[in-house]
């Protein structure tokens, strides 16, 4: 059995195996990988797509998802994260799926349990299953990631999605470019190219990953205005009309009119709904990888 704490823990062989299994689950919707297994889904942050897709994935693999609601737990009475983990550990669950605002919280959990731990997002650090579903969505369209030019746009500084995607897509041979307001870009990412605005590089790109503005993690005043952000870094109908080959992704939830205009959703090369569907099957494949 394996844990999935970050992208670094996955080999190229692991990634392609997960993609292949995801293809299988697109056709075969269920199996018994998790039969008689209780999987604790412990989300200390809010979520729709990730939490629900993991719950459905566990059920389709024959397991029982146990939902932990942080807002209704003893955390609201002052219990610490570690004490909560120690308490939950006593129930001998067979695996954990955890999301937490603290970076490395899944790694801390792993020191307390021998069961597989899957990181469903930890602070601004990692979100490996989001990166896997993003890469798979592109892979399913192209058949390969190798040699593709991919631009990541927006609040890179606060984005665990950006960090995981950069690491995964580079492993698969993509050339990664990043752009966003200077206040929202980290000082450096190894082997990436920074460009001034979305318009400076879009003509060379095969795909663009638009990032959500992480308002819950960022200080006020990091961008002059939402209107200016949309002008220099937003995806809009004019760009899609000019570059019809361009594939567009967004991890959701989107701030429409800022990161991407609502009109973009009508275009077949805007793959936001594909990402949501692929997210279920990727997470089934990840559970298979961790428990098989």
Where do the PLM segments sit?
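Glycine-rich phosphate/diphosphate-binding loop of Rossmann-like nucleotide-binding domains
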Residues: 44-56, 140-211
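C-terminal helix-to-coil terminal segments
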Residues: 266-292
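Rossmann-like adenosine-cofactor binding region
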Residues: 189-263, 269
């Amino acid at each position: 059995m394996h844990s999935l704490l970050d992208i670094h823990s996955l080999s190229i062989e692991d990634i392609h195996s997960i993609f292949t299994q995801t293809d299988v689950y697109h056709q075969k919707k269920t199996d018994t990988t998790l039969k008689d297994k209780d999987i604790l889904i412990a989300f200390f942050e809010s979520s729709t797509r990730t939490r629900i897709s993991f719950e459905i994935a566990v059920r389709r693999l024959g397991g029982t998802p146990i939902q932990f609601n942080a807002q209704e737990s003893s955390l609201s009475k002052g219990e610490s994260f570690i004490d909560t983990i120690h308490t939950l550990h006593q129930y001998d669950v067979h695996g954990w799926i955890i999301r937490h605002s603290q970076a490395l919280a899944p790694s801390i959990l792993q020191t307390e349990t021998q069961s597989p731990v899957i990181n469903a997002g930890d602070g601004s650090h990692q979100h490996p299953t989001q990166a896997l579903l993003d890469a798979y969505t592109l892979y399913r369209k192209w058949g390969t990631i190798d040699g593709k030019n991919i631009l990541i746009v927006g609040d890179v500084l606060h984005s665990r999605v950006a960090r995981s995607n950069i690491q995964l897509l580079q492993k698969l041979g993509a050339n990664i470019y990043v752009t966003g307001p200077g206040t929202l870009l980290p000082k450096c990412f190894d082997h990436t190219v920074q460009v001034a605005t979305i318009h400076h590089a879009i003509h060379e790109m095969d795909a663009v990953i638009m990032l959500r503005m992480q308002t819950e993690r960022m200080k006020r005043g990091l961008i002059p205005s939402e209107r200016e952000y949309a002008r220099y870094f937003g995806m809009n109908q004019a760009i899609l009309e000019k570059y019809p080959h361009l594939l567009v992704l967004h991890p959701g939830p989107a701030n429409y009119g800022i990161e991407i205009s609502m009109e973009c959703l009508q275009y077949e090369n805007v793959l936001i709904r594909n990402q949501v569907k692929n997210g279920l099957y990727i997470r089934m494949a990840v559970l298979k990888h961790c428990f098989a």
